[in-house]
């Protein structure tokens, strides 16, 4: 599992984001992790030229609701891309598998249906510590 250099990118290879409008849909579940991820996404967008006024952020209860939140954002806001941010941690039941599969397939479906890219930023780790390390 990668836990180092996760935030490295070559800024010279990224187009300037000044003229783009971004949406971020964040799961409220495991907020100590998803808040870090959202902050990192916003900081990165702004580092690439996006203005805070052009970044819309919505919250949904959990990762399973990310798909619905992204769909509604695409349909109601004029955005160029949306980032789905969530966290699912393995437990003792199959719930983890169902949530991960549903969210993944839902985001794939949104990317097929709409001309607005939906970026998958959902950590699916075995432990909370792994998620904290990666966030």
Where are the predicted features?
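Short, ordered loop/turn segments at secondary-structure junctions
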Residues: 29, 87-88, 122-127
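Short helix-capping segments at alpha-helix termini
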Residues: 46-51, 78, 113-114
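Extreme N-terminal tail/first-helix region
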Residues: 1-16
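Glycine-rich phosphate/diphosphate-binding loop of Rossmann-like nucleotide-binding domains
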Residues: 12-60
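Glycine-rich oxoanion-binding loops at beta->alpha junctions
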Residues: 58-76, 123, 127-128
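C-terminal binding/interaction regions
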Residues: 96, 101-135
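Glycine-rich phosphate-binding loop
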Residues: 65-107, 111
């Amino acid at each position: 599992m990668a836990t180092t250099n996760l935030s490295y990118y070559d800024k010279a290879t990224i187009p300037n984001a000044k003229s783009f409008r971004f949406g971020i849909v964040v799961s409220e579940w495991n907020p100590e992790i998803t808040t870090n991820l959202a902050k990192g996404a916003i900081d990165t967008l702004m580092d690439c030229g996006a203005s805070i006024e052009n970044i819309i952020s919505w919250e949904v209860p959990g990762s399973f609701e990310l798909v619905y939140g992204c769909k509604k954002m695409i349909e109601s806001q004029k955005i160029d891309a949306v980032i789905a941010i969530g966290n699912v941690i393995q437990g003792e039941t199959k719930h983890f598998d169902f949530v991960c599969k549903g969210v993944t397939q839902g985001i794939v479906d949104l990317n097929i249906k709409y001309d607005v890219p939906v970026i998958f930023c959902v950590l699916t780790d075995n432990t909370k510590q792994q998620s904290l390390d990666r966030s």
